[in-house]
């Protein structure tokens, strides 16, 4: 019995010790769990701070209760979503900046108070503001429209404005400005966008078109009036042998001049519409020019009204070039004819030619009337004449130099004139030249053989 009692007491004490040890273990585990939770909470808190700071690279990996695990996984997912969103925003920003940078139109944006928050380089150049800080400046001040418009006008009316501006090079520009509102999804207006389109060339072309139509009308009206007058005189009975032949001759001359003008206009139209193409061939340019000058020498013997001397001032060596011989003949003929027309009787006309590494330079000089300084920049304009009455009397259409300029441009060259009034003029043509072109062609032929 005693032994049984002792055994019972021992068992009871052992159970008590186990319970005590179990309690201590539970308390210890709870304390450890609480400490681990605190560490994990600190890690989660740090992760949130990293997200706020823009660091999305760290990934949490925690073991524990389901709630902690869920929070950790959600934070990792949120971090990845934010990272991808940030990358997309950066890519869109770069794409937008690239588009704005390469746009030929100027673009600027404002906040709701009309202050500039964005402007591209084109707009800065158009407004002459490259070196100025324009952010936060008023759009009204920037466009110089504060005297005529208020910000409310731009918002409520979104007008289209035509402005005169001066770019960074001091060139005057015509700008067409269009406005658009920046709206949020709620409809709240948060600012304006203005697009500046340079219409300088368009306005210039429109002015030239109007002037061209006016000139064509005038140039055709003058000979038509003459022809009409003479035909009316003939119709009314002026058919006697002493008068009628002169009337008919003048009518034919004016008709021929109109035909030449129409032909020149059609030629220019084909060039403008890019339907006039060069038929190039490889020729000896020295022989080509010499042939033209020989033709003019033969004409000189038949010319009764005007005597002139053609001087060749160039070496007789081969200059091989690819040109359209018909069109280039038209250019040289026109310049030589003008030199003869405006030179005094017995005048000297000098033709010079030389080459550089990559250019052929042809110049034709005369000692004629010359061109006034104020007229020199416009002599290649269509229908422009220094002396309209004299040019018309000599049968000119006023289009010869315009056509010459366009033909030279088709050959990727350029033409200009220097002149001193009363002393003469020099017309210079520069064409691209490759001195090795013939060597290469001969070498290719030898290889093919």
Swiss-Prot record:
The keyword NAD does not apply. The modification Phosphohistidine is found at residue 218. GO terms for molecular function: hydrolase activity; phosphorelay response regulator activity; phosphorelay sensor kinase activity; protein kinase activator activity; protein kinase binding. Autophosphorylation is decreased in vitro by dithiothreitol (DTT), perhaps because of disruption of disulfide bond formation and covalent dimerization. The chain crosses the membrane at residues 14-34. Changing residue 23 to A: Reduces transcription of the peptidoglycan hydrolase pcsB gene. Does not negatively affect WalK expression or membrane insertion. Residues 35-449 are cytoplasmic. It is a single-pass type III membrane protein. SMART domains: HATPase_c, HisKA, PAS. It is found in: Membrane. Changing residue 223 to S: Severely reduces autophosphorylation. This is Sensor histidine protein kinase/phosphatase WalK. It comes from Streptococcus pneumoniae (strain ATCC BAA-255 / R6).
């Amino acid at each position: 019995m005693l032994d049984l009692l002792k055994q019972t007491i021992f068992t009871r004490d052992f159970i008590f010790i186990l319970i005590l040890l179990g309690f201590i273990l539970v308390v210890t585990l709870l304390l450890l769990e609480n400490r681990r939770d605190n560490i994990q909470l600190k890690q989660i808190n740090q992760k949130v701070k990293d997200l706020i700071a823009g660091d999305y690279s760290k990934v949490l990996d925690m073991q524990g209760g389901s709630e902690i695990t869920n929070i950790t996984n959600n934070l990792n997912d949120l971090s990845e979503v934010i990272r991808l969103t940030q990358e997309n925003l950066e890519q869109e920003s770069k794409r937008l900046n690239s588009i704005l940078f390469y746009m030929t139109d100027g673009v600027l944006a404002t906040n709701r108070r009309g202050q500039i928050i964005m402007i591209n380089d084109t707009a800065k150049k158009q407004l002459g503001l490259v070196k100025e800080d324009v952010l936060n400046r008023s759009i009204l001040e920037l466009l110089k429209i504060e005297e005529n418009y208020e910000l409310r006008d731009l918002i409520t009316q979104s007008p289209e404005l035509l402005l005169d501006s001066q770019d960074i090079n001091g060139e005057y520009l015509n700008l067409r400005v269009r406005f658009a509102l920046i709206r949020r999804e709620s409809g709240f207006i948060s600012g304006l966008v203005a697009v500046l389109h340079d219409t300088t060339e368009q306005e210039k072309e429109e002015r030239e078109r109007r002037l061209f139509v006016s000139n064509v009308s005038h140039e055709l009206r003058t000979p038509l009036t003459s022809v009409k007058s003479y035909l009316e005189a003939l119709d009314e009975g002026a058919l006697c042998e002493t008068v009628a032949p002169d009337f008919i001759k003048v009518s034919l001359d004016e008709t021929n001049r109109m035909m030449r003008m129409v032909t020149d206009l059609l030629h220019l139209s084909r060039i403008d519409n890019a339907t006039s193409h060069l038929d190039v061939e490889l020729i000896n340019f020295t022989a080509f020019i010499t042939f033209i000058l020989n033709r003019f020498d033969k004409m000189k013997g038949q010319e009764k009204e005007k005597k002139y001397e053609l001087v060749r001032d160039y070496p007789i060596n081969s200059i091989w070039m690819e040109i359209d011989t018909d069109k280039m003949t038209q250019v040289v003929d026109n310049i030589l004819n003008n030199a003869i027309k405006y030179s005094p009787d017995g005048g000297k006309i000098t033709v010079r030619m030389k080459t550089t590494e990559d250019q052929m330079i042809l110049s034709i000089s005369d000692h004629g009337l010359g061109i006034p300084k104020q007229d020199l920049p416009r002599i290649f304009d269509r229908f422009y004449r220094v002396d309209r009455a004299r040019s018309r009397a000599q049968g000119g259409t006023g289009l010869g130099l315009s056509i010459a300029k366009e033909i030279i441009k088709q050959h990727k060259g350029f033409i200009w004139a220097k002149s001193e009034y009363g002393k003469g003029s020099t017309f210079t043509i520069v064409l691209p030249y490759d001195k090795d072109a013939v060597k290469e062609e001969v070498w290719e032929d030898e290889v093919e053989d």
